Amino acid sequence: MTQTAAQQPSPRLVSGHGLATTAADGAVLDVWFPAPVAGPLSAADASLRDTLRALAADDADRGTTQAVVELEVDLDAAPASTADAWLRLHALSHRLARPNELNLDGVFGLLTNVVWTNHGPCAVADFELTRARLRARGAVQVYGVDKFPRMTDYVVPSGVRIGDADRVRLGAHLAEGTTVMHEGFVNFNAGTLGNSMVEGRISAGVVVGDGSDVGGGASIMGTLSGGGTQRIVVGEHVLLGANSGVGISVGDDCVVEAGLYVTAGTRVSVLQDGEAAHTVKAVDLSGVPNLLFRRNSTTGGVEALPRAGRTVELNAALHAN
């Protein structure tokens, strides 16, 4: 009797036609994918390839060349090239994949550190000579020196407002109805899943649920440095008060008082009927809904109070983008 092998799941594919900019030393500075799709390359718009070929141009002042690339990647496999990494970042910002739902292992090693200018991406090596050549065209503005560009230079998602484009990296996932104010920040592989007000920092790996407000100066711990591995989720209808911070996931309909930073090891007194019932580490309350986290103004201790039946409501007029 023969046994039928277990059917392997179909790969999750993203594909697209892109325009790659390459420096004189062969380093890929950027790859723009204007219309990536979820699925195989055959599903992508073939006419876009000809449009991009017409746009491809060499730039002697920057020492760059451009060429069309065609790429199909398995989101569950690790990125295999610089163009592959760029396609994944575009997939996030085009909402083809949500944060933490695609493999980004090794992405930093694949991306090139680039001088981002108003004349396009430039190599870091000998940039002052490049700047001198570009000055013949007019003023040279350097937006940054980094591996990740501004999202809006490559993707402008529908239904969002962004007060300062410098504050949102390519690879950010902004859902319809998201407003990022001038002091808000959204890293790559992070973002919102619904209507949200962002006036604080959403670090890499963090997702914020529908109807939530990240208050001015608020901070949500990420996973890029310090050895952290916990993925933090901010639930739906959550308010993180101004200058607050969290190092744990926050459940639906929770409020963190302004100025209070709750790390995983913070000792929290859980109150019932106004009395302390027991004390736990904050990580034990990770993801628990309907809580108010506050600092007792007399003792300075951190407390968690139940707030069942109450929710956070955003101003709908501010999110009709």
Curated annotation (Swiss-Prot):
EC number: 2.3.1.117
Principal location class: cytoplasm
Binding residues annotated for Mg(2+) 1, in chain numbering: D166
GO cellular component, one term: cytoplasm
Catalytic activity: (S)-2,3,4,5-tetrahydrodipicolinate + succinyl-CoA + H2O = (S)-2-succinylamino-6-oxoheptanedioate + CoA
Active-site residue numbers: E199
Pfam families linked to this entry: Hexapep_2, THDPS_M
Subcellular location(s) of the protein: Cytoplasm
Ligand binding (Mg(2+) 2): E183
First-tier enzyme category under EC: transferase
Keyword Amino-acid biosynthesis carried by entry: yes
Key words of the record: Acyltransferase, Amino-acid biosynthesis, Cytoplasm, Diaminopimelate biosynthesis, Lysine biosynthesis, Magnesium, Metal-binding, Transferase
NCBIfam families: DapD_actino
Family: Belongs to the type 2 tetrahydrodipicolinate N-succinyltransferase family.
UniProt name for this protein: 2,3,4,5-tetrahydropyridine-2,6-dicarboxylate N-succinyltransferase
